[in-house]
């Protein structure tokens, strides 16, 4: 972690600090209420460590055009409840109201600004130079002594409030980013074998990218698949997965033929290292079926079957390091939760180093009471996948450059 400024690199007491977090959360489409607060909890240590500073919080919620693209007023209330402390909400990201609120702050005060993605400069600008010339950066820069970036779940985004200040004043990695990077690097450096990945859920494109990257670099020895991800690989390998399962993949993936071609390429190169289910539980019938049998057109492959659970559990038991992202099936429905429950329980009881990521994965672990048995449950979804896949992380690069510019 020598590459970044950390929060103990400076005396922040009495200083005015900008704190960029990621508290992007699911929203109930009927009531407009925030439904999950895991990401809020993840930032509490960082905020409490700034108890003697004036803290101004910047964050985003969703993106333009989405139903959950809402104000952060509710987010401020949730943080206030978690901290047992007033969090003042200002319905601007920059401007006279923000200037006034910051000028009136005392040490220990917390202010939260409006959704950064309400402003086109947050999402439209693509170069650091254009960001530095933006109203966001020119208006906010003079207000702060230090900029703390703690939005791990957004480290793969090059957006103005994340990277636009790093050449202007010192940018510091927050407590959450420090912990996330430390634990993920620990996982990456494990050399003991076998090292496995468990990829499930419905995000086929992400899982294909991870599979290709992990296997081509020899990063893992085996990948166990479940959910829609497994269905895609099975379809690509020539199995008839049934009409409803084909339609789901076709409907939810634009150029699905291209995805299937990528699956075929991975299977051609690394077929012996990619493990697919051999049996399933169907919805709505609830019956078990082998992948070699004819799958009725009206049935969904809703969970992995007993034979697959046994096979996967044996592989997990012998592993030295495990990365898990995505459930094995429709775990939210009790009748189709066995695969996820048994596989995740096997991981939790494994002696391996265990890294988990993705919203549905963390939700399932929490529901099963297994979170504390996982070495690291990451707040990153797409960010974690991108990081583990070896992609450049704009936020981490900006933090590194900021240290080079301002140290000594």
Curated annotation (Swiss-Prot):
This is Phosphoglycerate kinase. GO terms for biological process: gluconeogenesis; glycolytic process. Keywords: ATP-binding, Cytoplasm, Glycolysis, Kinase, Nucleotide-binding, Transferase. Its EC number is 2.7.2.3. It is found in: Cytoplasm. The keyword Zinc-finger does not apply. GO terms for molecular function: ADP binding; ATP binding; phosphoglycerate kinase activity. It comes from Thermoplasma acidophilum (strain ATCC 25905 / DSM 1728 / JCM 9062 / NBRC 15155 / AMRC-C165). Monomer. ATP binds at residues 332, 358-361. Its main location: cytoplasm. InterPro entries: Phosphoglycerate_kinase (IPR001576), Phosphoglycerate_kinase_N (IPR015824), Phosphoglycerate_kinase_sf (IPR036043). The keyword Transferase applies. Substrate binds at residues 22-24, 39, 60-63, 117, 157. Pathway: Carbohydrate degradation; glycolysis; pyruvate from D-glyceraldehyde 3-phosphate: step 2/5. Belongs to the phosphoglycerate kinase family. HAMAP family: Phosphoglyc_kinase (MF_00145). It catalyses: (2R)-3-phosphoglycerate + ATP = (2R)-3-phospho-glyceroyl phosphate + ADP. It comes from the Archaea. One of its GO terms (cellular component) is cytosol.
């Amino acid at each position: 972690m020598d590459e970044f400024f950390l929060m103990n690199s400076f005396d922040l007491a009495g200083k005015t600090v900008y704190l960029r977090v990621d508290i992007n959360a699911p929203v109930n489409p009927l009531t407009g209420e925030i439904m999950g607060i895991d990401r809020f909890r993840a930032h509490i240590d960082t905020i409490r460590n700034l108890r003697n500073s004036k803290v101004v919080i910047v964050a985003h919620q969703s993106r333009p055009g989405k139903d959950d693209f809402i104000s952060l007023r509710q987010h401020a209330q949730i943080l206030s409840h978690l901290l047992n402390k007033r969090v003042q909400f200002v319905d601007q990201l920059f401007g006279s109201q923000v200037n006034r609120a910051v000028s009136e702050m005392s040490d220990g005060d917390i202010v939260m600004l409006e959704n950064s993605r309400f402003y086109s400069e947050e999402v439209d600008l693509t170069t650091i130079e254009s960001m530095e010339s933006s109203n966001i950066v020119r208006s906010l820069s003079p207000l702060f002594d230090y900029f703390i970036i703690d939005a791990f779940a957004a480290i793969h985004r090059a957006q103005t409030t994340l990277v636009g200040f790093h050449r202007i004043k010192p940018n510091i990695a927050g407590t959450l980013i420090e912990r996330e990077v430390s634990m993920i690097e620990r996982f990456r450096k494990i050399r003991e074998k076998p090292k496995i990945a468990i990829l499930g859920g419905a995000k086929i494109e992400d899982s294909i990218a991870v599979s290709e990257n992990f296997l081509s670099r020899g990063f893992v020895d085996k990948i166990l698949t479940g959910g829609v991800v497994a269905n895609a690989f099975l379809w690509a390998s020539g199995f008839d997965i049934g009409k409803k399962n084909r339609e789901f993949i076709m409907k939810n993936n634009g150029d699905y033929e291209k995805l299937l071609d990528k699956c075929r390429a991975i299977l051609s190169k690394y077929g012996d290292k990619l493990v697919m289910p051999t049996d399933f539980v169907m919805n709505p019938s609830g019956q078990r079926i082998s992948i070699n049998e004819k799958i009725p057109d009206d049935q969904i492959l809703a969970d992995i079957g007993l034979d697959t659970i046994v096979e996967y559990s044996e592989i997990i038991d012998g592993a030295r390091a495990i990365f898990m992202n995505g459930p094995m099936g429709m775990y939210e429905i009790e009748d189709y939760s066995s695969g996820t429950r048994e596989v995740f329980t096997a991981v939790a009881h494994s002696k391996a180093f265990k890294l988990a990521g993705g919203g549905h994965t963390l939700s399932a672990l929490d529901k099963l009471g297994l979170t504390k048995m996982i070495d690291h449950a990451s707040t990153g979804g797409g960010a974690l996948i991108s990081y583990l896949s070896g992609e450049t992380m704009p936020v981490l690069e900006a933090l590194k450059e900021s240290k080079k510019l301002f140290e000594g």
